[in-house]
Amino acid sequence: MAAQNEQRPERIKTTPYLEGDVLSSDSGPLLSVFALQEIMQKVRQVQADYMTATREVDFTVPDVQKILDDIKTLAAEQVYKIVKVPNISFRHIVMQSRDRVLRVDTYYEEMSQVGDVITEDEPEKFYSTIIKKVRFIRGKGSFILHDIPTRDHRGMEVAEPEVLGVEFKNVLPVLTAEHRAMIQNALDGSIIENGNVATRDVDVFIGACSEPIYRIYNRLQGYIEAVQLQELRNSIGWLERLGQRKRITYSQEVLTDFRRQDTIWVLALQLPVNPQVVWDVPRSSIANLIMNIATCLPTGEYIAPNPRISSITLTQRITTTGPFAILTGSTPTAQQLNDVRKIYLALMFPGQIILDLKIDPGERMDPAVRMVAGVVGHLLFTAGGRFTNLTQNMARQLDIALNDYLLYMYNTRVQVNYGPTGEPLDFQIGRNQYDCNVFRADFATGTGYNGWATIDVEYRDLAPYVHAQRYIRYCGIDSRELINPTTYGIGMTYHCYNEMLRMLVAAGKDSEAAYFRSMLPFHMVRFARINQIINEDLHSVFSLPDDMFNALLPDLIAGAHQNADPVVLDVSWISLWFAFNRSFEPTHRNEMLEIAPLIESVYASELSVMKVDMRHLSLMQRRFPDVLIQARPSHFWKAVLNDSPEAVKAVMNLSHSHNFINIRDMMRWVMLPSLQPSLKLVLEEEAWAAANDFEDLMLTDQVYMHRDMLPEPRLDDVERFRQEGFYYTNMLEAPPEIDRVVQYTYEIARLQANMGQFRAALRRIMDDDDWVRFGGVLRTVRVKFFDARPPDDILQGLPFSYDTNEKGGLSYATIKYATETTIFYLIYNVEFSNTPDSLVLINPAYTMTKVFINKRIVERVRVRQILAVLNRRFVAYKGKMRIMDITQSLKMGAKLAAPTV
């Protein structure tokens, strides 16, 4: 017997189908992959029709698995970095003086190189530059100090010089011994103090840091010091509730020792996800549906019922002429099995995916197929009450097919009394005169289909996701029941099935009634499985909100189009018979199921960051109208999208909806208040708060035109000249006197250009030693240092561009104010061999551009002031402490197999 058992081939659970002329028996493509292909094909078809007369759009199907992998990678990324020493905030430029140096704030120097040059006619570039500068602030300030280098000095722990944030080593070789000793004494006083933050021992010291960067650092440190213990408890408690709903155990492996005294932990994301953030995205219903399928839908096989059911009910006679008997032995083709997959997708996503019948004029439809489909369609689908699986057209076609089947009297004649309306099923049949009108579709009550006299949507205990509290109960089956396929369904029934059996008996279809009576347990197992999949696996932040779900059916009946229109998939008549004869049996749960909450949180967090960015950018046009003359809301939308992670953009654009988003959609989304709290959002908001002062972004509107001679000092005393540390800059200490400033608006400039007097007017102002300010446009500012005469394009550069040309006998002038402005510092270096007039030229050089920024970017300081900028409090975690990012713990552990699988 053992040998016989070994030789017995493995039982094939899936049903065979014809792929061309080859009989195949594999399970075909995964239902989730197939769903993506079919939904996208339908969406692309509609979009392609819409875009026929307009621009071309790329309609390639996205790789959802790659998108999910990229989002998981995003979850692993840290928005902060752990460093031993902070960035250098101040550096010094050595001059020939022994007691004076130039101190440079490196933040402003580096910020001046970030982004592109702003122009008036490229608002998208302006928005993109602002985003880059804000992200630069966030990136520079998002650091945690850990294991800083220290030394021992007379029993005290003292910070090493590189920890202080000031670079001065290049200054030491030119200092006197007295000055070096003074600096050394100051360094020896940089004592590390022991502190206690959130019951953890830390090092506290005073260092130097630029104001915008320190704001981000301080906000990050406050986020860590707030511990977020309650947020972690809420997240873990919610995960345990979700695990109970989805039959998944929560893994505590990451959290076994995070409460130890030597551990500092950071929670960058939070659960549960605010579903409003995900569903507020414009035109996102199809993308969210695809994400729900990709992250939650299980894999499974299509199981056929016991073949003895049909053999002892439908085909027990030698000759069989009934429609059911004719179709009993048929085998589906690959296309027909694909239609079966569509049917089960529609059953798993009620209301979101609905079915319609294929219109194929070239196909000659067998009446038997239509009749059988009309009967089983009324037992497979729900049409009304609370939701629908069908379009109104398909429901009517099924009613007509059922009407034809009941009137097809192939065994014996049965009495029929027709009604007055001529509608399908408007007759009474049989000796007891069964009224068939009750099987005509009524979307208001669900009469005639599975929702008839059944509570198929229920609200009971609170669900983990607050936006989707509904429980689907096809056929009145409670999804909490455990399913044993060998015994489940025996003795169970529901109203529509009972009425169908009564009507078939009244119509003289006894064999078919016996068949359906025998199929009832198989039928109940089918819908019990579907109920479990919907209420357990598919429960997600991407599930359709209850208010949208409740509005789907009324909107469909009324022909109203809302934010979540259903996806319509086409199926063939015969596929209804094959779907009735097959049940979707889940074999493996989705691989993404346990990590789905983390993916959802990352996605919602990135959406919140994008929304905050767009809110601030939307205010720019009102703050700086001169630089955004041609700006439209679509410009800052595109700028934020371009600087967002590719994975998030791909999810938002899964159905290529970005090609169809309008300004109304966009502005409505930006102004909605919902946000998903996270560390990244906190730092982004703080970065925008720091960026509210545009001078901190190295952008300014205080740019003046003034003719000033480049200094040419006489070198009567070279030693004294070197000690003074002489330098020149076009950076103003204060704005010029207001009564000497001429404000040149675009209108004034255009008027004078039209009169041909623009240059002459400016020359007259320059000769009077006055100042010209060209509008209030923001300009990009760069900082450069020179130890020799700067190039002429910097010295002679004007704060505007003015071009003239002639065409067709007419003169044209182009004036632009938004040009790149350079703040330069010229450091004079002389030698003892220089003569008194070494720096004097016969023809003097002039500078034409002056800039005022109310920030201390560069200043000349004495040596004893080198460490005067040490005024920021830093917290560093000791080297023996562990800094642990527990964000990855926000995922569930092992998936539990269903007790009956």
From Swiss-Prot:
Cell location? Virion
Top-rank taxon: Viruses
UniProt keyword Cytoplasm present: no
Keywords, ordered alphabetically: Virion
Protein known as: Core protein VP3
Keyword field contains Heme: no
What does this protein's UniProt record list under function? The VP3 protein is one of the five proteins (with VP1, VP4, VP6 and VP7) which form the inner capsid of the virus.
User: Which molecular-function annotations from GO does this UniProt entry contain?
Assistant: structural molecule activity
Q: Which family does it belong to?
A: Belongs to the orbivirus VP3 family.
Q: Name one GO cellular component term.
A: virion component
Q: Which organism is it from?
A: Bluetongue virus 17 (isolate USA) (BTV 17)
